[in-house]
Structures are given as C-alpha cells and as structure tokens.
Amino acid sequence: AIGGTQTVADKFEELLVNDNIIFNNNDSHFYDSGMYHTLNVLLKRKLGIKGITTALSTGCTAGMDCLGLGFEEIIDGDLDICMIGASEAPLVNFTYATLDVIGCLSKNTSDYASCPFSLDRNGFVISEGSAFLVLEEYNHAKDRNARIYAEVEDFHSINNGNHMTNLKSDGLDMYELLNILFKKRKETTIDYINAHGSSTKQNDLFETEAYKKFFGKDIYKIPISSTKSMIGHSLSSASLFGCISAIMSIVTSKIHPTINLNNNDEKCDLNYVPNYSINKTVNNALVTASGFGGIHSAVILKKVKEEGE
C-alpha cells in the first residue's frame, strides 16, 4: 500500500535535520527499499522462482487483488501455479502522521480500540504483517498430491469514482460490486462473510448497507466477522488475512468473532459474531475489502468437493 516506509521515513527525518545531507555508498539500497516489487525479486531469488513478476499498488485491497490476478492468470491458462502475497510494515511516525491527518486512526488507546461495527468505533488501529498463499490449477495440485484448502470461485474489483477516502453511506458501490461478482451464480447463498470491518464510522455502515441491499432479509441469517477486530489494519495484507481467515473457517467449520463489540450501533444491526467464535459448516464464504482511492474488491471462496461427493 505504501512501500518501504521505514527506509523512506528514516531518510526524510534525516533531511529535516541536515540540509547538507550527502547520499553515499551507505544509501545503495535506498532506491530498492522504496520500490514496490523489491519483495517479489528477493523472494524469487531466494526460492529460485521464475516467470511473471507483478507488484500491485492498490492500497488496502492489494492482497486480495493479487489473489484475483493470480486466479485470472490460472483461469486463462497462462499459469499452473503461482505464489501471491502482501506485506506491510508501516509502523513509523511518517505513516501515523499521514493517516492521522485525514482522521482515520482511532483516538482510543485502550485494548478495545479496534471495535468494528460498535457504536464506540472511531477509527482503525494500524498494524503490520505478511500473508501469502499458493494458488494452483486444480488438476495440477491433485497430480502432485497437494493439500487443497479451498477453491477460488470468482473475484471482481471496481472503483467507485467518487472520492479518495470517503464512502457513501448507502453502500451502493459495494452493492454494485456484489451484483457483478454473483452474476455467474444461480443463487446468492453464502455461509459466511469476512468483512473489511475497519472500525471506522464510514466503512462499517457502508458495508452493512451494501449487504442488506444485496442479500435482503437473508443477510440476518449470515454470520459476518471482522479479522481486524483482533489484529488491526495491516493495510495491503489485511484483505489477504481476511481471505485466509475465511479459508480456515471453511477448513475447520469455525468462524472467528468480531471482538470488542460491546456497544451495539442500531444502524449496524447484523450478526457480526460478537466476542465469541461459533461452530458452523462453511461451504462457501464471501470476503470483501475496500481501499483508499475508491477501490472495492470481493472474492468468493468455497470448499473443494472430493471425487464422489
């Protein structure tokens, strides 16, 4: 989402206190550290991987967008297998200041600060982390006896063309995305939704309204939870953490809760699995994500049916 922030922040702070700074041999990795595809190159060199190298910079949807790109490459027959991932280490003053000035960070310093869908929510809690998945064509995976955790049914992404950060409270943009995503399906039945659930006033209402518009009364029967309630918002990798959480719900038949949901918001009145996990068979799951720049992405994941099922 924001590149090599630690290196850039260090150099920026150095420039502030030293007008005559000289870039010397010690700065040989400064350029590499700021490039978005440096991680790709280092991983491929370490693992001996060749082929397509792509770095997506789509903000907080980037991890899921990488999954979508890999999925489309495999569907088109261009790849049999690929590794996709997202990584973010934004915990530096430079990032805090940038996000704070637009008012999206929580001002709450307690352990309950990340509280998606709660009346008490007032911004997200920034975090860091890396998430990676191996995507593979089904027969290719079966031929090498790989463990298959789940199947990608479909992916789609849109831009709302509205605002860099603001979201319309009616949820229509996410609703339009879901209409496109589900167009190929004969039904809209979903067992679980892993929401973007960022703990901001705008986003959580935006998603809630979108779900209501698309699923109608059935939405009250679908459990929804936010991974960010427990691990914060890790920007680009957050959407992929959401996908992994949904995959593990499919594998384990357990849905993690939205913690810190102790004060209900009457406008956010769906089943957000408050505070305690639940046991439920999950045959398919929807994961949604939104990012600065007006990007909205979503993916449907499903349980793999073995031969004879």
Task: Put a short name on every predicted segment.
Residues 187-188, 220, 269-309:
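Flexible, low-complexity linker/loop segments at domain and module junctions
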Residues 66, 177-185, 210, 214, ...:
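Stable alpha-helical structural segments in soluble proteins, enriched in small hydrophobic residues
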